[in-house]
Amino acid sequence: MGLELFLDLVSQPSRAVYIFAKKNGIPLELRTVDLVKGQHKSKEFLQINSLGKLPTLKDGDFILTESSAILIYLSCKYQTPDHWYPSDLQARARVHEYLGWHADCIRGTFGIPLWVQVLGPLIGVQVPEEKVERNRTAMDQALQWLEDKFLGDRPFLAGQQVTLADLMALEELMQPVALGYELFEGRPRLAAWRGRVEAFLGAELCQEAHSIILSILEQAAKKTLPTPSPEAYQAMLLRIARIP
């Protein structure tokens, strides 16, 4: 059996790995795990990834459970074009520098609007307004750092070409954008960066990867989202409670 990728395109890192694999012609058997239904908390999936998170890559008996590690693994295994994960030591270090900061300051912060506008209401929970405002402030600060520290006057986050850093960042920022947040308004450098990354990836691939998240508000309004399992419901309550 070939490589298996367990994913849900509602998930930002799942989309990053999906886009990377598609763009580079990497053969993967896709296994959809519905996050809203709570399939990532099922006994079957927990036997594959005890952390109960997506994406997860299975290469025979070898299992990887973190998106950045999966991207690096695929890049090296399939010898994708060097710009993604540069062989030059300093250029590669820049990619790792961003990915480390991304895990601390981007990942999680930009996912909170989905909990506020879709997932919380789905289970009858409203996130307190003071938490919503704190999250807006945190996103604004992170965008400023992203623009000033990592983008600067370069075309891409880690240099002159698209890298894994750009892909991870774009997918995280797409989450609130899909929910109506004007993240790029008043930020022409970031807006131009987004345009360059999407142009490189191609409109068709971006639309394919983003179609589910772009339609999730409409699904919520029409009440067509699936009902979470009891296990997922409890996990969702805990996640909402942890919003700072």
From Swiss-Prot:
GO MF term set: glutathione transferase activity
Stored InterPro entries: Glutathione-S-Trfase_C-like, Glutathione-S-Trfase_C_sf, Glutathione_S-Trfase_N, GST_C, GST_C_Theta, GST_N_Theta, GST_Theta, Thioredoxin-like_sf
PROSITE patterns noted in UniProt: GST_CTER, GST_NTER
Catalytic reaction list: RX + glutathione = an S-substituted glutathione + a halide anion + H(+)
Keywords assigned by UniProt, alphabetized: Cytoplasm, Transferase
Tissue-specificity statement: Expressed at low levels in liver. In lung, expressed at low levels in ciliated bronchiolar cells, alveolar macrophages and alveolar type II cells.
Record CDD domains: GST_C_Theta, GST_N_Theta
UniProt enzyme class: transferase
GO terms for cellular component: cytoplasm; cytosol; extracellular exosome
Gene Ontology terms describing biological process: glutathione metabolic process
Amino acids binding glutathione: 40-41, 53-54, 66-67, 104-107
Coiled-coil region list: none
Domain GST C-terminal: 88-224
Cellular compartment(s): Cytoplasm, Cytosol
EC code: 2.5.1.18
Residue ranges occupied by any GST N-terminal domain in the UniProt entry: 2-82
Role this protein plays: Conjugation of reduced glutathione to a wide number of exogenous and endogenous hydrophobic electrophiles. Has a sulfatase activity.
Family of the protein in this entry: Belongs to the GST superfamily. Theta family.
Subunit structure, interactors included: Homodimer.
Protein name: Glutathione S-transferase theta-2B
Gene source species: Homo sapiens
Organism phylogeny: Eukaryota, Metazoa, Chordata, Craniata, Vertebrata
